[in-house]
Amino acid sequence: MTYQQPDAKGFYGKFGGQFVPETLMTAVIELDKAYREAKEDSSFQAELDDLLKNYVGRETPLYHAKRLTDHIGGAQIYLKREDLNHTGAHKINNALGQVLLAKRMGKKKIIAETGAGQHGVATATAAALFDMDCTIYVGEEDVKRQALNVFRMELLGAKVFSVTDGSRVLKDAVNAALRAWVAGIEDTHYIMGSALGPAPFPEIVRDFQSVIGREAKRQYAEISGGKLPDAVMACIGGGSNAIGMFYPFVNDKSVAMYGAEASGLGLDTEKHAATFAKGRPGILHGALMDVLQDAHGQIMEAFSISAGLDYPGVGPEHCYFNEIGRATYDSITDEEALEGFKLLSRLEGIIPALESSHAIALAQKVAAKMSPDQSLIVCLSGRGDKDVMQVKERFEAEAEGK
């Protein structure tokens, strides 16, 4: 049976939906209508395709990581090089698509949230390209962790708003951006950066990011004589690079799908972002999904060395995949991710983002259990330039025995 999700009300099984205040329903309905029309308009897709090719630099390579493969001694590992996109990550695929959509809707202002800063940079980039006013909401903790990306956003002409509410991280930035959207509904479009939020956001983000999996599928077929890979893999916070990799393979039952979530300091601590391992269904940011919550239903703080993965929920389509067993989600600690970061840098000369390093760490475990005639495609969602100073300080502190 062909996979057809979400349903007409934006649900993936029991997950998803539109749990938003009345003040936002108008905007959500307007966005849904505009998106359906854009999908049917070949000129919209043609303009986006042109930008992806000539501005972003797509398609990105599918790279056979031979030294990493030899080191692990199992499946052949291929890297889908989203780190080579303009702005350094997969986020630009969605940001450009949504800015085009905003322009089509006659909006003048763009707002967005960001954690690792990559979505903020991508949104500020797209807004600069289309001469649109842009404000990015960033948790105060992430402003410190990602100072370089904050400067990039400002350089691109965006206003950066430091969010001091709550734990001052990604979920708080989303809250602030949603409030700003309510206040400026007439002329403002909110660009959700991950496959989260009220419908139609998870579907929009999935569709714009599916270019990752579509390209990877075709590229692998070209080098393998028309075959499918045995498995695909990606890191998962909210889940946009993962859904972009998974969705084009969802009907190919022979292809296993693996997501690497962040278990921070460990599942036996409260310092993690392992929503599938430790969460349960709840409503957050306009959708029903698995979330980290205490016994009273209060949203808990997520924790990860990676600013892009410390979100206390995960997109509704991933929740559905997890429930029906279509994808397998495993947890990777900070230490394991740092080992993945070092390993890829030293074996392949590619410095990955800390987010992507979680996928590299999981690839080591999964590939080792596979045979050399099998293949695994890992989405290398972003490059590690933004994380180098943070990792340097971490390694120096460890060397000093702190």
Curated annotation (Swiss-Prot):
InterPro entries: Trp_synth_b_CS, Trp_synth_beta, Trp_synth_beta/beta-like, TrpB-like_PALP, TrpB-like_PALP_sf. CDD domains: Trp-synth_B. One of its GO terms (molecular function) is tryptophan synthase activity. It comes from the Bacteria. The keyword Coiled coil does not apply. Gene3D superfamilies: 3.40.50.1100. The keyword Iron does not apply. HAMAP family: Trp_synth_beta. This is Tryptophan synthase beta chain. It comes from Streptococcus thermophilus (strain ATCC BAA-250 / LMG 18311).
